[in-house]
Amino acid sequence: MAEKKTDYASLKKGGFMRQKQKGYFSLRLQVVGGNLTAENIRVVSEVADEYGKGYVHMTSRQGIEIPFIRFEDIEEVKAKLASGGVKPGVCGPRVRTVTACQGAAGCPSGCIDTYELAKELDAHYFGRELPHKFKFGVTGCQNNCLKAEENDLGIKGGMIVNYKEEDCIQCGVCVKA
């Protein structure tokens, strides 16, 4: 009986990247806008302990990777993560997970709701196949902490100030805008 050949391209498309150690994969997770719930973090920790080597790697794009997942554990890992609301990310020539700063939800300078926008972009575009990988980034204000220009499409929040001298309290917002 012929041995079943492993489809590495499909695994990579689903966020599983081959490691240099034979039979092991690093799983990239979908972390939209850099936000995870406490439950998401718990299940990621459990998977890293049970199926990996007890740690995760934080990527430069607000992502998480769980290294040292054995090939034979991949389906169990996906099921366990799904039970905690965590989805695998993607690799290769696809739209990647959308990154975002805290925006108006928590940052004093935030002009837009970056997380809601990141979720919308992710819902419409995540995982779409393209000729090359494609990255979205959403930053909430002109401080540009997310470095919008370093993405293929960066969105930067801003405001239009309606200056009325009689209402001015010298807050400085119009100077920053």
PLM region descriptions:
Residues 2, 27-161, 167:
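Small-residue-enriched alpha-helical segments and adjacent helix-cap loops
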